[in-house]
């Protein structure tokens, strides 16, 4: 996608945004839109202090997108951003990818939600089984939360146990949520273990003998696993009669076509996938060994929209492009370029910060002594990057997409130099 695929609404404004010396915000904002949002009672997420604070709320109120194309998006005020949120990782090829769009449109023209299964359903199942280590069969759902929830319920059905131990974020369902509205009895059945700390997981099995149905975990959140750690956890689970479940909703098809399992040489009893699987379209997958997956009919697992052929078509097209264009390798290369550039920019600005994470999901960490200063530095940095046309969040690692270019990365690094300098002046 060319750099000018999205042009600012004002022809006089270039893709580069103003670069203030001492202010975090310089993007244009519509006062009329701001007044409308503040008065609105219809959209609960748009009101101050509610759900999307820190994610979509930028400059004091949400940014409403007008259009997204490739690695760029334009908001309703005409500001253009290089998008490092990318639908929180679901848009791996780039927004509005033409091959995915064509596949989806063709599927929609055949019918949106037929009562019977479209052949694309079978095609996609066979493709996922080809790609995912130890996956004998698969079922499809709509969200990552759905897939992980189904995996946990299946583990409980197979083992006859209720307790779960976990690492990472798995969605908002009762079994893994600690928010209000969840019964204390449900919360009591979940214990979390420290990442890369095998002894902590061993201690939980010792504390709850013959009670734990499964280990469910993200293979990594930011830092990679220590050598042998994932396989050691798998062996620990099996030794204690539990299943080993990997939540690959973020990692799957991103760090490699075989996901984290192929990347780190481990295989799970059950695996959940989503996000990058369909380039932003709503579909997820639960894959696993046949001896376990064969029990899935006992769960009463039904989803009205799971047959949607448009999502199946999107996933098939996405997986085709991921493999043909070797997209995971491209993500790793671009991410490594960004991370090394950010490290150099922080050094040149004299700011104690460094890049962290895997290249396909980069992030930065400030090294100030006090947590309050580290958190403030991260907010200031992301706000300063926003004002320079780069959409990042302080609350979640970032993502790379296939439509980003070396020039996009280099532009981001130049902006980061100014953002780090701003942070240094403010803290």
What is the role of each PLM region?
Residues 16-22, 80-158:
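Glycine-rich loop-to-alpha-helix module at the N-terminal edge of alpha/beta enzyme cores
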Residues 4-13, 323-325, 384-427:
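PLP-dependent enzyme catalytic core of the Aspartate aminotransferase-like
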Residues 264-296, 307-314:
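Active-site PLP attachment segment
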Residues 63-65, 335-340, 348-382, 404:
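Conserved PLP-binding catalytic core of the aspartate aminotransferase-like
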Residues 123-213, 234, 336-339:
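PLP-dependent aspartate aminotransferase-fold enzymes
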Residues 219-243:
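Active-site core of PLP-dependent enzymes with the aminotransferase class I/II
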Residues 22, 318-340, 371-375:
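Structural signature of PLP-dependent enzymes
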Residues 15-68:
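Active-site-adjacent loop/helix segments that line or gate small-molecule/cofactor pockets in enzymes
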């Amino acid at each position: 996608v060319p750099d000018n695929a999205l042009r600012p609404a004002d022809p006089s404004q270039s893709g580069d945004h103003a670069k203030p010396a001492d202010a975090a915000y310089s993007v244009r904002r519509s006062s009329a839109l701001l007044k409308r949002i503040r008065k609105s009672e219809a959209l609960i997420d748009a009101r101050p202090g509610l759900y999307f604070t820190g994610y979509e709320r930028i400059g004091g109120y949400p940014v409403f997108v007008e259009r997204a194309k490739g690695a760029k998006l334009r908001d309703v005020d005409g500001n253009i951003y290089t998008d490092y949120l990318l639908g929180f990782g679901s848009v791996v090829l780039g927004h509005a990818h033409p091959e995915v769009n064509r596949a989806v449109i063709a599927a929609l023209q055949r019918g949106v939600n037929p009562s019977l299964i479209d052949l694309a359903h079978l095609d996609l199942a066979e493709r996922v089984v080809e790609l995912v280590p130890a996956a004998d069969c698969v079922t499809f759902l709509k969200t990552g939360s759905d897939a992980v929830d189904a995996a946990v319920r299946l583990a409980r059905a197979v083992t006859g146990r209720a307790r779960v131990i976990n690492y990472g974020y798995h969605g908002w369902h009762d079994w893994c949520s600690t928010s209000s509205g969840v019964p204390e009895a449900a919360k009591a059945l979940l214990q979390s273990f420290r990442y890369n700390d095998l002894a902590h997981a061993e201690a939980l099995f010792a504390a709850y003998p013959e009670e734990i149905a499964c280990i469910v975990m993200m293979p990594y959140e930011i830092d990679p696993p220590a050598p042998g750690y994932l396989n050691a956890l798998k062996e620990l689970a099996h030794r204690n009669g539990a299943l080993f479940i990997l939540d690959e909703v973020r990692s799957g098809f991103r760090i490699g076509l075989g996901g984290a399992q192929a990347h780190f040489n481990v295989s799970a009893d059950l695996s959940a996938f989503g996000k990058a699987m369909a380039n932003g379209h709503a579909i997820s997958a639960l894959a696993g060994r046949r001896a376990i997956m064969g029990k899935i009919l006992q769960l009463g697992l039904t989803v009205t929209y799971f047959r949607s052929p448009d999502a199946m078509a999107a996933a098939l097209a996405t997986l085709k492009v991921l493999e043909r264009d070797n997209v995971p390798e491209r993500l790793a290369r671009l991410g490594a370029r960004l991370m090394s550039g950010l490290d150099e920019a922080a050094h040149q600005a004299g700011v104690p910060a460094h890049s962290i994470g895997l290249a396909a999901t980069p992030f930065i960490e400030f090294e100030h002594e006090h947590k309050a200063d580290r958190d403030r530095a991260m907010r200031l940095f992301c706000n300063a990057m926003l004002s320079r046309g780069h959409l990042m969040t302080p609350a979640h690692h970032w993502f790379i997409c296939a439509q980003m270019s070396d020039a996009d990365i280099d532009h981001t690094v130049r902006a980061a130099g100014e953002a780090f300098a701003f942070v240094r002046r403010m803290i």
